[in-house]
Amino acid sequence: MHGRAPSIVGVIGAGTMGAGIAQVAIEHGHETVLHDVDAAAIERGRARVREGLARRAGRLGLDADSIDDWVDGRLALLRDAPTIDALAAEAGLVIEAAAEDLGLKQTIFRSLGVAAAPDAILATNTSALSVAALAVVSGRAGHVVGLHFFNPAPVMALVELVVTEATLPAVADRAEALIAGWDKTVVRCADSPGFIVNRVHRPFTIEALRMLEAGEASVERIDAAMRADGFPMGPFELMDLVGIDVNLAAARAVWDGLGRPDRLRPSPIQERLVADGRLGRKSGTGFYVHGSDGRPTGVSADFATPDPGTVDEAAVRDRILGAVRAEARLVAESGLATEDDIAIALRLGAGHPRSPFD
């Protein structure tokens, strides 16, 4: 299999990300094997794949009968495996998409190190954990990479290819060629906290929270300023959409991993909201109040104010984008990723309207 794309793809974890990755693989003609310790999760995962394929077929303009045939034809490529060992024994590419728990992922990679074919590519979809910490326990670190898909995987074009110091260049090249063949845009980065997007985009929310903490600008002014600059949504709208708890967990992981620099210190406002169960759209309230359809109906009472603050929209943009640019320069100057890959990653992964290096 050396130098060739694997024909069989294994996906470990049948949650939202695992199912999405499996859908992408079968859409591109790969026989795909799915494993999850929870049999019910497998069934839910298959249902997600079917729904995703049906949406995709609908966008292709197929009629109802043709949609069913198209979906069924691709679903025939998807099957489940009872164990990790069974999956690993036949897959040329294994993508681990289990929960973001280092101990769990290390257990999986220990098993893969024993059971996978000698030339198999072993990948993790982690968004925050150390790829090297998984590679070392596998016993075959040269064949381990990160393949960080963005949610929803069938829709988002970006994949971060994360290489460790031990990753063999030929393995990284094979992984990149395969994922590019799935109509994804692949950017490379070294194994470091947050990779590209989750690190460089971090000041987008942190700097906004700092201004809110200091009473310098309101939630509405900050969000309006960034939308006016070409972003699809402002920092507070984004945190409510993603989940304030999810955003806080990522902020903590990057902050801890980089040695707790003050510039990336998580905000006490987020800590308080998470402690109160105010997680954004999924809980009904966060920085905004959300209706039954999930759409914001107004700013939450404790953030609503007739005073928009002393910092105008232009200064809000300068503060936030200045912090993003500074982080982008740090990543580029450290040799973790190229300027071009950083710019592409921010555009496709976080909706940035322009390069931070412009």
Question: Where are the model-predicted features located?
Answer:
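N-terminal glycine-rich phosphate-binding loop for ADP-containing cofactors
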Residues: 1-358
